[in-house]
C-alpha cells in the first residue's frame, strides 16, 4: 500500500496583491494553503524582503547595524540606492522618523520631498511608513499620496483613527495601504471592514498585525498571525484573506540584547553576530506564521532569510549558504573566565571532617512508676437483669417463661439495639 500524505482542505485563499508599477512590480500572496504547505496547495509567490531606510540619521542604532550603511546614513536616496544595487533589496521601506511630533516634527512638505528623492534613486516598489502618531501620519501620508500620484506607493500604517483620510487619499491618487491593528484578530478584521466600507478595494490592502521582537512580543504576534491565517484559509473569511507585512528590523534592533556591547554583556557573545542572528531567527518565525513581506535591516540577516525562503520553497541544502560576513573586528571573549569555578573533586575522594568529641549527655532519671489502677470487679450480667426487673416491679421468672427467652437474650438485645436493660424488659412486658 502506497503512502499518502493526509491533506487539509481549505475554504479560502490569500489574495494575490501587486505592488509597484511596470517591470518593477511585485506580486505577493496568492497561496491556497498554509505557509509553505506546497503538498496541500499552491504558493505561486514567495515571500519577499524589504530593506528599511530612515529619513534621518539614526542616533541609537548599534554599531553592527550602522556598519553596512555608514557611508550613506545621512542621505536617504543614496541609502536606498545602496540597498537595491549592493544588497539586492526587493522593496524599500522609508521610515519617516523625522515627522514624529515628539522628535523633529518635520512637515508634510519636507516628508514628501524626501519620498520623491528616494523614488528617483530606485527602481523597486517603495513603502512609506509613518511614525504611528495617527493624526500626524494622516496629514503627512495624505500629502505624500497627492505629491506622488501614480507612483503606486504603499502607505501605512493606517489605523481606525485615520483610515478615512489616508484611505481616501490612497484611492484618489492610486496607492495601496497597510491596515494596522494592535495584535488582535477582531481589530484586524474591523479595520479592513471600515476600509472596504469607505470604498477601498481589498486587493489594495496589506495587513500589519503589529510585530514584536524576539521573546514574549513575538509569541503574541505569531499567535495572532496564525489565527488570522486560519480564519482566512479554513473559515473562508474574505476580510482577512490578505497578505501580511511585518516591520521586523525596527523591533529587533531596538531590543536591549541587540544593542549591548561585549563589555556590557560578554556572556552573550559577539554583538554583531548576535544581532544578525536575532533578526534572522525572527524572520524565519514570521515566515512560518504567514508573512508575505518582511521589513528587515541588516544585509547578513536578509541573506539568511532569503536562503531559508529558497530552501523551503525549492529544496536544496543549507550547506550551500554562505556564512555570516562580519564588517566589524572580531572580539575575543574568554568564556572560561566568565564561568563559575567548577569543583571537579570526585564524591568518593571527599573526606568527611572528623566529628568533634562531646561529653556524653547525662542520663535522665527514670520516671516513677505509675501505680496500677485497681481492677474493677467483673460485672454479673444476670444480676443486672434481675436488679432491673426488680426495680420495675416485674416478676422476671414469669416474664422469661412467658416470652421463652433468657437473661442473656435480654442483655444481648440491649447491646445490639443500644438500649438499656430496663427498656428491653419493659418492651417484653408490654
PLM segments and residue spans:
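N-terminal amphipathic alpha-helix/helix-capping segment at the start of soluble metabolic enzymes
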Residues: 1-70, 332-348, 354, 359-360, ...
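Hydrophobic faces of well-ordered beta-strands that scaffold small-molecule active sites
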Residues: 47-53, 90-94, 126-130, 151-157, ...
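Active-site mouth loops of central-metabolism enzymes
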Residues: 50-78, 103-106, 130, 134, ...
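Glycine-rich, proline-tolerant flexible connector loops at the mouths of alpha/beta enzymes
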Residues: 60-67, 88-117, 122, 128-134, ...
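Catalytic domains of carbohydrate-active enzymes, especially glycoside hydrolases
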Residues: 71-97
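Acidic (Asp/Glu)-rich catalytic clusters
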Residues: 84-87, 115-121, 142-149, 166-173, ...
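Catalytic alpha/beta core domains of metabolic enzymes, predominantly
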Residues: 161-308
Amino acid at each position: 500500500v502506497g503512502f499518502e500524505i493526509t491533506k487539509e482542505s481549505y475554504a479560502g485563499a490569500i489574495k494575490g496583491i501587486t505592488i509597484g508599477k511596470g517591470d518593477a512590480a511585485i506580486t505577493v500572496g496568492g497561496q491556497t494553503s498554509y505557509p509553505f504547505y506546497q503538498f496541500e496547495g499552491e504558493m505561486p509567490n514567495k515571500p519577499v524582503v524589504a530593506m528599511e531606510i530612515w529619513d534621518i540619521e539614526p542616533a541609537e542604532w548599534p554599531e553592527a547595524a550602522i556598519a553596512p550603511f555608514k557611508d550613506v546614513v545621512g542621505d536617504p536616496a543614496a541609502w536606498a540606492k545602496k540597498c537595491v544595487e549592493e544588497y539586492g533589496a526587493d522593496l524599500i521601506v522609508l521610515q519617516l522618523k523625522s515627522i514624529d511630533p515628539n522628535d523633529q516634527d518635520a512637515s508634510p512638505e519636507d516628508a514628501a520631498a524626501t519620498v520623491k528623492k528616494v523614488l528617483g534613486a530606485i527602481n523597486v516598489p517603495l513603502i512609506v511608513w509613518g511614525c504611528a502618531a495617527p493624526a500626524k501620519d494622516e496629514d503627512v501620508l495624505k500629502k505624500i499620496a497627492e505629491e506622488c500620484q501614480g507612483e503606486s506607493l504603499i502607505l501605512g500604517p493606517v489605523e481606525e483613527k485615520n483610515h478615512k483620510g489616508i484611505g481616501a487619499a490612497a484611492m484618489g491618487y492610486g496607492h495601496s495601504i497597510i491596515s494596522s491593528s494592535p495584535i488582535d484578530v477582531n481589530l484586524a478584521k474591523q479595520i479592513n471592514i471600515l476600509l472596504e466600507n469607505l470604498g477601498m478595494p481589498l486587493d489594495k490592502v496589506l495587513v500589519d498585525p503589529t510585530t514584536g521582537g524576539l521573546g514574549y512580543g513575538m509569541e503574541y504576534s505569531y499567535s495572532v498571525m496564525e489565527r488570522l491565517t486560519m480564519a482566512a484559509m479554513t473559515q473562508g473569511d474574505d476580510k482577512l484573506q490578505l497578505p501580511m507585512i511585518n516591520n521586523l528590523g525596527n523591533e529587533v534592533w531596538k531590543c536591549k540584547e541587540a544593542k549591548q556591547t561585549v563589555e556590557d554583556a560578554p556572556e552573550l557573545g559577539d554583538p554583531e553576530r548576535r544581532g544578525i542572528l536575532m533578526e534572522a531567527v525572527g524572520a524565519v518565525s514570521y515566515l512560518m506564521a504567514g508573512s508575505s513581506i518582511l521589513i528587515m535591516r541588516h544585509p547578513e540577516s536578509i541573506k539568511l532569510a532569503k536562503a531559508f525562503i529558497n530552501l523551503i520553497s525549492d529544496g536544496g541544502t543549507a550547506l550551500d549558504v554562505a556564512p555570516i560576513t562580519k564588517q566589524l573586528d572580531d572580539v575575543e571573549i574568554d568564556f572560561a573566565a566568565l564561568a563559575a569555578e567548577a569543583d571537579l573533586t570526585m564524591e568518593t575522594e571527599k573526606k568527611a571532617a572528623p566529628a568533634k568529641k562531646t561529653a556524653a549527655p547525662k542520663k535522665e532519671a527514670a520516671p516513677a512508676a505509675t501505680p496500677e489502677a485497681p481492677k474493677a470487679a467483673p460485672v454479673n450480667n444476670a444480676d443486672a437483669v434481675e436488679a432491673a426487673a426488680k426495680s420495675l416491679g416485674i416478676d422476671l421468672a414469669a416474664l422469661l417463661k412467658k416470652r421463652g427467652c433468657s437473661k442473656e437474650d435480654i442483655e444481648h438485645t440491649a447491646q445490639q439495639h443500644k438500649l438499656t436493660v430496663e427498656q428491653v424488659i419493659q418492651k417484653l412486658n408490654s
